[in-house]
């Protein structure tokens, strides 16, 4: 079951087709680590995260950001089954990595900010509403193993 209207799906997929996953992924994860520094504890193996410039210039941050957004691309292909799409990732983040599920919500909100920056006037309030709905759905799907 999906709460996404045809308009939501069109807004999400249309913008997604214009997203540069490398740029947006690195920017999104980097901003998460800068704005919410307690999230850095999950990335000890990434090397120096000692300052905003170290984080934003860190190739491991960028690479993982690409991985995150690539996974999001799979979600966009499966908007009607986000929980199924993220079942294994939810299990990994809950059982092995012990990530606080609130971090998924924070990451989604940072992504929306990055998309607004990168896509300017194209990121209308209607497009934002659809993307907020989608990132909330992804956060809920990723947190599903915790319940």
UniProtKB/Swiss-Prot annotation:
A biological-process GO annotation = hydrogen peroxide catabolic process
- Listed binding positions for heme b are 64, 93
**CDD domains assigned to the protein according to its UniProt record, in alphabetical order:** Hb-beta-like
**Molecular function terms in GO for this entry?**
haptoglobin binding; heme binding; hemoglobin alpha binding; metal ion binding; organic acid binding; oxygen binding; oxygen carrier activity; peroxidase activity
Q: Which GO terms describe its cellular component?
A: blood microparticle; haptoglobin-hemoglobin complex; hemoglobin complex
Q: Does the keyword Transport apply?
A: yes
Globin domain boundaries? 3-147
**Keyword Membrane, does the record have it?**
no
- InterPro entries from the entry? Globin (IPR000971), Globin-like_sf (IPR009050), Globin/Proto (IPR012292), Hemoglobin_b (IPR002337), Hemoglobin_oxygen_transport (IPR050056)
Where in the body, by tissue, does this protein show up? Answer: Red blood cells.
A Pfam family this chain is assigned to: Globin
Alphabetically list the UniProt keywords.
Answer: Heme, Iron, Metal-binding, Oxygen transport, Transport
Give the highest taxon in the source lineage.
Eukaryota
Write out the coiled-coil annotation as residue ranges: none
Question: What is the similarity comment for this entry?
Answer: Belongs to the globin family.
**What is the protein's quaternary organization?**
Heterotetramer of two alpha chains and two gamma chains in fetal hemoglobin (Hb F).
What role does this protein play?
Gamma chains make up the fetal hemoglobin F, in combination with alpha chains.
From the Swiss-Prot or TrEMBL record, give the protein name: Hemoglobin subunit gamma
Tell me what organism the protein belongs to. Ateles geoffroyi (Black-handed spider monkey)
């Amino acid at each position: 079951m999906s709460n996404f209207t045809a308009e939501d799906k069109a807004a999400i997929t249309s913008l997604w087709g214009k997203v540069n996953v490398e740029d947006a992924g690195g920017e999104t994860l980097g901003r998460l680590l800068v704005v919410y520094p307690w999230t850095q504890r999950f990335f000890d193996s990434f090397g120096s995260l000692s300052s905003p410039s170290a984080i934003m210039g860190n190739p491991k941050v960028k690479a993982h950001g690409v991985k995150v957004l690539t996974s999001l691309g799979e979600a966009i292909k499966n908007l009607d089954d986000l929980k199924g799409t993220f079942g294994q990732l939810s299990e990994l983040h809950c059982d092995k990595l012990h990530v606080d599920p609130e971090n998924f919500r924070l990451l989604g909100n940072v992504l929306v900010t990055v998309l607004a920056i990168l896509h300017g006037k194209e990121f209308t309030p209607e497009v934002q509403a659809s993307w907020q709905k989608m990132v909330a759905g992804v956060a809920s799907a990723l947190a599903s193993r915790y319940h």
